[in-house]
């Protein structure tokens, strides 16, 4: 079943987080995308400087609090389906959804935990 949705429903955020020592800019790509149920979806997050594996991936649906999917770059949060996976370290990170399900249509974003305001 082809279940196309507006790109903004699977939108991505470009986030910038000020750091205590210096500013770390997080850039996601693509900025938005359109996908169908069953598709393999890959989202990339790049840090302006190395953050080791201090990165989490989050899913947010309208009117709901963010849900953490991945912590420490590649560790699956308890209760999160195994179709979600994370990889990377240093400056480049990837979130992959191996087979997109209807409930996966949401906004996804990365958050670095290496440096805080």
UniProtKB/Swiss-Prot annotation:
Secretion signal span: 1-22
Domain Ig-like: 24-117
Protein name: Immunoglobulin kappa variable 1-17
Subcellular location field: Secreted; Cell membrane
Pfam family, one: V-set
Assembly description: Immunoglobulins are composed of two identical heavy chains and two identical light chains; disulfide-linked.
Biological source species: Homo sapiens
InterPro entries: Ig-like_dom, Ig-like_dom_sf, Ig-like_fold, Ig_sub, Ig_V-set, IgV_Light_Chain
A molecular function (GO) term: antigen binding
Alphabetized UniProt keyword annotations: Adaptive immunity, Cell membrane, Disulfide bond, Immunity, Immunoglobulin, Immunoglobulin domain, Membrane, Secreted, Signal
Renumbered residue ranges of the record's region Framework-2: 57-71
Disulphides: 45-110
Name of the gene encoding the protein in the UniProt record: IGKV1-17
Region annotated Complementarity-determining-2, chain positions: 72-78
UniProt GO BP: adaptive immune response; immune response
